[in-house]
Amino acid sequence: MLPEKRLLTPDDMKLWEESPTRAHFTKFIIDLAESVKGHENSQYKEPISESINSMMNLLSQIKDITQKHPVIKDADSSRFGKVEFRDFYDEVSRNSRKILRSEFPSLTDEQLEQLSIYLDESWGNKRRIDYGSGHELNFMCLLYGLYSYGIFNLSNDSTNLVLKVFIEYLKIMRILETKYWLEPAGSHGVWGLDDYHFLPFLFGAFQLTTHKHLKPISIHNNELVEMFAHRYLYFGCIAFINKVKSSASLRWHSPMLDDISGVKTWSKVAEGMIKMYKAEVLSKLPIMQHFYFSEFLPCPDGVSPPRGHIHDGTDKDDECNFEGHVHTTWGDCCGIKLPSAIAATEMNKKHHKPIPFD
């Protein structure tokens, strides 16, 4: 079967939350997080397996595609997402099976078909030109699928799946976010961790659990943030936020991160991040109604048959009007288009008129 979306109602969500599929996937995330405790970004686990190198080559192919589609139309006039992102998306989608086959030749045609859906959906929504934690989730499903098919061995690869593969994925997403001004999907405004990502904070908190000197409150020290931005995921995310939301303090534009900084230890932060991921991503219907079940992520018995809301990368604007689709004022899916902070910052730079003393 092709991967399909099945979560449409609160009853479906209850079945999902109690399912072995969710438990196994959550354990996969936690195992990856546990494997990077005490590791800086560059502290890979040696030797690096052929499978990790193949995944890095796959990401390199995706990165190459980003270079083929420069922003041309309305480059200076719109605060919303750039339409050239759709060309990037289309090229990835056309070539996803070919790219997967080139790096993982042992996979069957059926396995490639399953995995290609998650690879396509890892980079954002073509129609809305946005990105959020649901798209990030698709990338983790891709890694989980490769693990399920025997490509990755967690005893050898888990640390490098975060420190090499996930970090490279994050770098590519930063390119896409800044180049195409991707709009935030699933953002809770200033009450979210980040306009786009969740897992860098989760993995980053686990990295820091054994650090003797850095504390959660350290994110308010800009010198420390800059010093450790390339060494720890959490500080890298704070540095990125400070860069694109430079007109105000972290306390104002990211109050949830500010609240978390008051926690005494990174271990408590890490524990809280797991709980938050389960509650705010894996248990939110506006996000999970877009979740694909597949051969390696089987749908729980009793869940609604496939119908309703389907985002397939087409330009059909009626896809959010099916019966059963849950709308949300948070913008997790079909809400008001929100310009990204990146777009606002870049537009301000373009139209800024310096005073004579600058």
UniProtKB/Swiss-Prot annotation:
Its EC number(s): 5.2.1.8
Pfam families for this protein: PTPA (PF03095)
Cytoplasm is among the record's keywords: yes
Cellular component aspect of the GO annotation: cytoplasm; nucleus; protein phosphatase type 2A complex
Record-annotated membrane-spanning stretches: none
Subcellular location: Cytoplasm
GO BP term, example: mitotic spindle organization
SUPFAM superfamilies, per database record: PTPA-like
Keywords attached to this entry: Cytoplasm, Isomerase, Rotamase
Domain of life: Eukaryota
One example GO MF annotation: peptidyl-prolyl cis-trans isomerase activity
Keyword Cytoplasm belongs to the record: yes
Reaction(s) the record says it catalyses: [protein]-peptidylproline (omega=180) = [protein]-peptidylproline (omega=0)
Extra facts: Present with 2430 molecules/cell in log phase SD medium.
Subunit structure: Interacts with the phosphatase PP2A catalytic subunits PPH21 and PPH22. Forms a ternary complex with PPH21-TAP42.
Function: PPIases accelerate the folding of proteins. It catalyzes the cis-trans isomerization of proline imidic peptide bonds in oligopeptides. Acts as a regulatory subunit for TAP42-associated PP2A-like phosphatases modulating their activity or substrate specificity, probably by inducing a conformational change in the catalytic subunit, a direct target of the PPIase. Can reactivate inactive phosphatase PP2A-phosphatase methylesterase complexes (PP2Ai) in presence of ATP and Mg(2+) by dissociating the inactive form from the complex. Acts also inhibitory at high concentrations.
Protein name, per record: Serine/threonine-protein phosphatase 2A activator 2
Organism: Saccharomyces cerevisiae (strain ATCC 204508 / S288c)
Annotated gene: RRD2
